[in-house]
């Protein structure tokens, strides 16, 4: 899939060329240091339904920012260093 939905890992490029990585998750999974953002966050709301190679302008608390969607994936990528929870 190259469309952004809930649960996606996303690589964005900002206007300065910096690569940013996020995962869209539910409220109980938010982990900002690891890039896990709420599905209700302004950034996530602006990305859901968009595709790889789309340019998206999102209104954030700091103002409008434009991002290029470089990659969307639904399997855990190598860069996700968040510990995997252990279930017993």
State where each predicted segment sits:
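Non-DNA-binding regulatory cores of transcription-related proteins
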Residues: 1-67, 73
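Short, solvent-exposed secondary-structure boundary/capping segments
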Residues: 32-36, 76-87
